[in-house]
Amino acid sequence: MKNEAEMQLDEKQENAVMAAVRNGIMILTGGPGTGKTTTINAMIEYFHSENMEIMLAAPTGRAAKRMTEATGWEAQTIHRLLEVNGNPEEDENPNRNGFARNADNPLETDVIIIDEMSMVDLPLMNALLTAIVPGTRLILVGDCNQLPSVGPGSILKDLIASECFPVVMLTRIFRQAQESDIVVNAHKINRGEPVLLDNKSRDFFFLKRQDPNVIISVLLTLIQKKLPKYVNAKPYDIQVLTPMRKGLLGVERLNSILQEYLNPPEPGKAEKEYGDHKFRVGDKVMQIKNNYQLEWEVCTKYGMTIDKGLGVFNGDMGIIKNINTYEETVTVEYDEQRQVKYPYAILDELELAYAITIHK
């Protein structure tokens, strides 16, 4: 539980908590730094005090991990919440949707809070709603100004525009968030105002270069030397974003260059060529389509399986841990130490992820 000093709410945050208490469904939205997480914590504290069962979830493993860290309560991916056990697109029973939790076997809880709703697509939202029984409170949280999901639908924005549900929009940027120029500039961009460019900023920098090759040179210096020293980050913790896939500064060329600099070939380091890609042990990779049949497992350092399940999803990122030429498999470790063995035949579901598109 958060202490009282941390849980002081402004009027809109209090309204959001009351809306969550009084309604079966409500939407909490707002930009970065507006106190969505603090409001979620206040909701959790109230429902917990009423001895109500609470489930927290988010669309991706990374978002679920952040939610866990921010609330102190265990959060999981929506796929894991629903216990994926097949491909929803191939399941002929509309009540199942490829998940163990469905209309015939609904979620047993009083409250469900979903964060990062802007990333939820239509099929996943349908599966979630199918598994919720009347009487369960559903709280949807997200930033409606973020890019919509990679899959079909713009769920959060459409639900807000429908005016069918209680919506609380947080607009006040709290003092701690105001110290971040990223947060300040995000709100300026949303308002159509020029951003602040200050060389003394702690977290927002603009380096103007014209020549693509010079840009790449600066990029490599930042990743290999400057940023690891400045923010104490490993090169693998640094994500390069670009708006395009093709071209001199597109994802494909950048990944090829970054791979050679950050994870060059070495004697004894296994690699596998697949089409235009070359995968190497130690590479940062991303799953680029939903695969509901892929098995994952979590093992101890002695190889004993302690958890396992199905499903790896579009946008999941991990590190190649092993390439077994005898088995013809590539093993990738994802968040929460989940390891997946990819047969060579489905390596088209992976791509290098040193650089990714902004939408991804």
Where in this protein do the model-derived segments appear?
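Conserved helicase motor core of SF1/SF2 NTP-dependent helicases
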Residues: 19, 27, 46, 50-52, ...
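P-loop NTPase nucleotide-binding/switch module
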Residues: 2, 6-9, 14, 78-110
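Hydrophobic positions on the alpha1 helix immediately C-terminal to the Walker A/P-loop
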Residues: 39, 43
